[in-house]
């Protein structure tokens, strides 16, 4: 990717033209994805090249402002707003990875560097000084073997279930959750000692026992509710209100469904513990369901986040600040002229990224809403990448990837989005179209096989925390 620095939005960028490749595209839409006559938010995003391969990255930001971008076996750190990056792993950390994940505890600043070692176990490392030094447990997972799709997160203790002994722990003030799939089951464990070991937990009951074991990230709310999203046909969430001792399930989104193959749905919670669940719908738009009672009930009429001009999407991610203030990222395509044409299997293409032909290109989009809890929320979307992130199909089913000048599974399974303590948004993604692919006039899918780690963050614009107001670019005197 050739872009660096800020993407500055102007009034001309609001013009919507089908199948264009202009650098900046801006949309202001309602809950049906339709354009509304409102001014766009003043969103300026800054790009950073991490300088290493970075498929399925995780991102987190400590209170000091250090950014951690974890992909493959390398915990990359930048403490100068993405100007420079360094691999800060030491000998206590995993030497290789079969599946990476990273997490920054927003309360304690503990940085977790997590790696699946084959399917046998998980090597969990952690740092309490911005990656200056690390500790680690090379065998820190539940029953073995076949532990896959690992995830970790932290959250507050409650006064029920595992929270009763956990709240008395003098070792670490937060609960640490570790989830993975084993065949058709999702297993989640709770740690009383900051992730050094996981003493309690097991297979989650409900949807996770018989409807597929793959799942999205773990999300926690300020009130202690924990969410896990199963990768299932009907959008659903699994949640616990007792620090993982017991779990319940809820479904939503039957009005829009999901595609096949499908990737993870994701949940975010705001400062009042309202929850926002997003997923790719059956028409390949990004959809939202909201809960205002800590996951007990969810609205059954889904809201469309992505503009209708974006006809194919994957890899949605979300985070939230104060009530109604959310940010979402995803990969998407506006090549609507390819709908109904032939896909890579010679069948009629319906927008599924897994089967997209070489005339379809995918960009990175970031969407903001500052009133997402309203009856009529407004979504502000920016296509931030000036050139494609991927040309042609994106493998969404590891058993059906294609060799088109190399595997189209170069991006792997997900991107990531998190906010810092000031409500500034950071997006981690893998760029599959760099160098000649990005600058060429006729780049093809076989040119789009890189997996370069990259990041966008909000340079200036509204914080997701209302009290912060508008953020300015780092180094700006106000």
Predicted regions and their residues:
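Extracellular, repeat-based ectodomains that mediate carbohydrate processing or recognition
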Residues: 15-478
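Secretory targeting signatures
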Residues: 1-20
């Amino acid at each position: 990717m050739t872009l660096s620095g800020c993407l500055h939005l102007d009034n001309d960028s609001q013009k919507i033209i089908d199948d264009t490749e202009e650098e900046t595209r801006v949309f202001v839409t309602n809950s049906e994805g339709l354009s509304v006559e409102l001014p766009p938010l003043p969103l300026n995003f800054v790009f950073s090249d991490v300088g290493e391969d970075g498929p399925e990255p995780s991102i987190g930001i400590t209170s000091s402002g250090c950014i951690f971008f974890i992909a493959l076996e390398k915990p990359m750190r930048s403490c100068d707003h993405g100007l420079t990056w360094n691999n800060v792993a030491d000998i206590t950390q995993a030497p290789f990875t079969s599946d990476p994940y990273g997490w920054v505890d927003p309360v304690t600043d503990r940085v977790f560097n997590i790696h699946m070692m084959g399917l046998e176990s998980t090597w969990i490392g952690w740092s309490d000084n911005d990656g200056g030094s690390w500790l680690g447990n090379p065998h820190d997972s539940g029953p073995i073997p076949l532990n896959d799709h690992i995830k970790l997160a932290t959250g507050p203790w409650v006064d029920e279930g595992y929270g009763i002994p956990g709240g008395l722990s003098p070792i670490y003030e937060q609960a640490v959750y570790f989830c993975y799939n084993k065949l058709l089951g999702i297993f989640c464990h709770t740690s009383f000692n900051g992730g050094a070991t996981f003493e309690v937990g097991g297979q989650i009951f409900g949807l996770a026992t018989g409807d597929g074991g793959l799942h999205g990230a773990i999300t926690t709310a300020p009130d202690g509710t924990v969410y896990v999203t199963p990768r299932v046909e009907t959008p659903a969430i699994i949640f616990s209100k007792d620090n993982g001792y017991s779990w319940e399930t809820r479904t939503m989104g039957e009005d829009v469904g999901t595609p096949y193959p499908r990737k993870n749905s994701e949940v975010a919670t705001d400062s009042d513990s309202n929850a926002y669940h997003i997923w790719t719908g059956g028409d390949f738009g990004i959809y939202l369901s909201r809960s205002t009672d800590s996951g007990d009930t969810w609205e059954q009429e889904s809201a469309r986040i992505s503009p209708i001009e974006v006809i194919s999407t994957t890899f949605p991610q979300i985070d939230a600040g104060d009530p109604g203030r959310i940010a979402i990222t995803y990969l998407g395509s506006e090549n609507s002229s390819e709908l109904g044409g032939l896909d890579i299997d010679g069948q009629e293409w319906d927008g599924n990224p897994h089967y997209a032909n070489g005339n379809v290109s995918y960009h990175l989009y970031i969407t903001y809403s500052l009133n997402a809890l309203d009856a009529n929320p407004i979504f502000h979307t920016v296509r931030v990448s000036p050139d494609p992130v991927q040309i042609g199909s994106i493998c969404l089913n590891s058993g059906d990837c294609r060799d088109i000048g190399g595997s189209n599974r170069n991006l792997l399974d997900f991107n990531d989005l998190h906010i810092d303590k000031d409500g500034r948004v950071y997006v981690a993604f893998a760029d599959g179209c760099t160098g000649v692919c990005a600058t060429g006039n006729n780049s093809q899918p076989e040119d789009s096989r890189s997996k370069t780690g990259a990041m966008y963050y909000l340079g200036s614009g509204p914080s997701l925390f209302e009290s912060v107001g508008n953020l300015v670019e780092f180094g700006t005197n106000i």
